[in-house]
Amino acid sequence: MINMRKTHPLMKIINHSFIDLPTPSNISAWWNFGSLLGMCLIIQILTGLFLAMHYTSDTLTAFSSVAHICRDVNHGWLLRNLHANGASMFFMCLFLHVGRGIYYGSYLYKETWNIGVILLLTVMATAFVGYVLPWGQMSFWGATVITNLLSAIPYIGTTLAEWIWGGFAVDKATLTRFFAFHFILPFIIMALAVVHLLFLHETGSNNPSGINPDSDKIPFHPYYTIKDALGFMLLLLVLLLLALFSPDLLGDPDNFSPANPLNTPPHIKPEWYFLFAYAILRSIPNKLGGVLAVLASILILLIIPLLHTANQRSMMFRPVSQTLFWILTANLITLTWIGGHPVEQPFIIIGQLAPMPYFLLILVMMPLAGLFENYMLKPEW
């Protein structure tokens, strides 16, 4: 009998993607984050679906419906804690996945990389609209501050902001449409992830050495399925520890108070995974300038493939580029730390200085380091 997984039209696709897929034999644990992101997405969609069954997107009842889920729904507290902390795990994996792509030169698969950047933006949009749904103080004021940035766009800004709000301020119409967006976007992310995989499998996976691995490939199953399963277990362990022992560790205490348009929290800040962008936004005194800087900080990823000057793909054997990469990582951690602090000295001056090395490192220093490393590899040395 002919093996069904190799002949059946549907099984054939799964076989070529997850079973008989030729994979480089030397890919490290840094390549686990793609599958971990897939698992995070499935967890978020499933927990989100059950939460949506009990949530009401109305300004009068949204906050109490979340309290009702946690108190009265069977395991509702667990669903909510898994969903809220699942978002943190999602972004942790995302940042590590993007960092791995930059370090090992995976961005040279341009189509895969560009779809990945679009995915990052879509996930950020989903997380933002999702954070508004519990209708706590920080949800409301976060939505007000961020959507109000649209009014910085010349000519059409105010009209655009009011169109998004569905009125003259963040209110019932805004909450209803944000719930609709938050429900549909994960399915769009799922479709984009399939396209991301499609482009990846056109070229095959990159590997730590950055050289062509065609001479030494192994089947994906059982080697990498077992490796991914270990990653799944570790991620689930961390997520469950977080959701069961310290579910509010990464949240904001202000969000335990219902939204009050007449009372501004002392310090408005987003979730931890947006703090780096928030720090860049606050670093520029001009409203439009801040918006453009935040957009540039994410969209700069799209031009990274064009800035690759090194003869070697990976940073594995490029110590100067490695040093700059880790300085960039430290810079992003600094920005995240600054974004979580109130606007007062010394945080103001650090916040104004920190975005400069971020852009300088990506646009100037790393391309120059690549050229320098090429020069040092010349035979006369």
From Swiss-Prot:
Heme b b566 binds at residues 97, 196. GO terms for cellular component: mitochondrial inner membrane; respiratory chain complex III. Component of the ubiquinol-cytochrome c reductase complex (complex III or cytochrome b-c1 complex) that is part of the mitochondrial respiratory chain. The b-c1 complex mediates electron transfer from ubiquinol to cytochrome c. Contributes to the generation of a proton gradient across the mitochondrial membrane that is then used for ATP synthesis. It is a multi-pass membrane protein. Heme 1 (or BL or b562) is low-potential and absorbs at about 562 nm, and heme 2 (or BH or b566) is high-potential and absorbs at about 566 nm. Keywords: Electron transport, Heme, Iron, Membrane, Metal-binding, Mitochondrion, Mitochondrion inner membrane, Respiratory chain, Transmembrane, Transmembrane helix, Transport, Ubiquinone. Heme b b562 binds at residues 83, 182. Binds 2 heme b groups non-covalently. This is Cytochrome b. The gene is MT-CYB. It comes from the Eukaryota. Pfam families: Cytochrom_B_C, Cytochrome_B. Belongs to the cytochrome b family. A ubiquinone binds at residue 201. The cytochrome bc1 complex contains 11 subunits: 3 respiratory subunits (MT-CYB, CYC1 and UQCRFS1), 2 core proteins (UQCRC1 and UQCRC2) and 6 low-molecular weight proteins (UQCRH/QCR6, UQCRB/QCR7, UQCRQ/QCR8, UQCR10/QCR9, UQCR11/QCR10 and a cleavage product of UQCRFS1). This cytochrome bc1 complex then forms a dimer. InterPro entries: Cyt_b/b6_C, Cyt_b/b6_C_sf, Cyt_b/b6_N, Cytb/b6-like_sf, Cytochrome_b, Cytochrome_b_C_euk/bac, Cytochrome_b_N_euk/bac, Di-haem_cyt_TM. Its cofactor is heme b. GO terms for biological process: mitochondrial electron transport, ubiquinol to cytochrome c. It comes from Dasyurus hallucatus (Northern quoll). GO terms for molecular function: metal ion binding; ubiquinol-cytochrome-c reductase activity. The keyword Mitochondrion applies. It is found in: Mitochondrion inner membrane. Its main location: mitochondrion. Gene3D superfamilies: Cytochrome Bc1 Complex, Chain C. The keyword Oxidoreductase does not apply. The chain crosses the membrane at residues 33-53, 77-98, 113-133, 178-198, 226-246, 288-308, 320-340, 347-367.
